[in-house]
A protein has these predicted regions:
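Short, charged/polar connector segments at secondary-structure boundaries
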Residues: 1-86, 95-142
């Protein structure tokens, strides 16, 4: 695993919206983000794991730019996007996905319990407290 990130311009088609993303983005959230991007442009680093193609952070921004660009997954609508590329193994990707989600927005603990095994992830490294981890364990036991 290489530490840090490298700024790159890649094709949108290289990005997978992370299926384990524990944040829920409503249509209203995306619409608000889209309006802001149209006003001031795309600001901030979109964190992308080059190893898996998965996003770590920036799902709402990418979904908003998709709407602006009319992206539908076809080569005709593909576009260039600036990302902060990292080279993480799957475990580190998941830990950072959780860390970024927890540090920015309220997260859905049910999604965390569904998508992340207590035995698989170091929840402390992902920014979770002992109480958070106990809550996730309880949800997994249900």
């Amino acid at each position: 695993m290489k530490k840090g990130s490298e700024t790159k311009i890649i094709k949108r088609s290289q990005i997978n919206l992370n299926p384990c993303n524990p944040k829920v983005h409503t249509d209203a959230d995306i619409k608000q983000q889209k309006a802001n991007i149209k006003k001031v442009g795309l600001i901030g680093g979109i964190q992308w794991n080059e190893t898996t193609g998965n996003l770590i952070d920036g799902h709402k921004r990418v979904m908003s730019v998709d709407l602006i660009q009319g992206y539908d997954g076809t080569p005709e609508t593909d576009y260039d996007i600036k990302v902060e590329a990292v080279d993480f193994d799957e475990k580190t990707e998941k830990e950072q996905l959780l860390f970024m989600a927890k540090s920015q927005d309220p997260i859905d603990y049910n999604l965390v319990a569904k998508n992340f095994s207590i035995d698989e992830i170091d929840f402390k490294a992902a920014g979770f407290t002992k109480q958070d981890t106990e809550q996730i364990k309880l949800l997994q036991d249900d």
